[in-house]
Amino acid sequence: MAQNRFHSGTGPSQRQLRVGELIRRTLSDVLLRGDVHDPELNRHSITVGEVRTSPDLKVATAYVLPLGGHDAEEALAALRRNAGELRHLVAKAMTLKYAPQLRFVLDETFDRMDDTRRLLSEDRVRRDVESHPEDDED
C-alpha cells in the first residue's frame, strides 16, 4: 500500500515540489496575461507565492495575494469563481495526466514575517537575547 508522504511528517516528494512550482509559474503567467474572461479578476494584480500539490497530484492549493494586499477577499472570490477556467488554461499549458483541481488560499507569509519582525524588535525580547548569547563552541 502506498504511503501518504505529504502528511507523514517527511514533507512533499520531489515530484510534488516540481509539479507545484510548474503550476505556480503557469498560473502566474495566465493571470499576468489576463487570459481569463472575467474583467473583475483581470483588474487585480495577483501574486502566486506557492502551490502545494496533493500526493496524487490531483489537487493543487495556490497561496495567493493581491499586490499591495488590497481587496484580498474580493480577489480570492474572483479566483474561486474562475477556478474551472483557470484549471483549463493551466492544463492546456502543461503535460500532466490529470489537470489538478485548483484551490485558492490567501498567502499569509508576509503577515507572519511582519509579526515575527515586530516581536523580535520588542525591548524585552532584545534584552532577553542579549542576556543569553549563544555558545559558538563546536
Curated annotation (Swiss-Prot):
Q: Which HAMAP family match?
A: RbfA (MF_00003)
One GO molecular function term of this record is:
ribosomal small subunit binding
**Keyword Magnesium found:** no
Q: Which Gene3D superfamilies match?
A: 3.30.300.20
The organism of origin for this protein: Paracoccus denitrificans (strain Pd 1222)
Q: What is this protein called?
A: Ribosome-binding factor A
Q: Give the gene symbol.
A: rbfA
| BP GO terms, sorted | maturation of SSU-rRNA
State the similarity comment.
Answer: Belongs to the RbfA family.
Task: Quote the function comment for this protein.
Answer: One of several proteins that assist in the late maturation steps of the functional core of the 30S ribosomal subunit. Associates with free 30S ribosomal subunits (but not with 30S subunits that are part of 70S ribosomes or polysomes). Required for efficient processing of 16S rRNA. May interact with the 5'-terminal helix region of 16S rRNA.
| Signal sequence, start to end | none
Report the PROSITE patterns cross-referenced here.
RBFA (PS01319)
Q: Which GO terms describe its cellular component?
A: cytosol
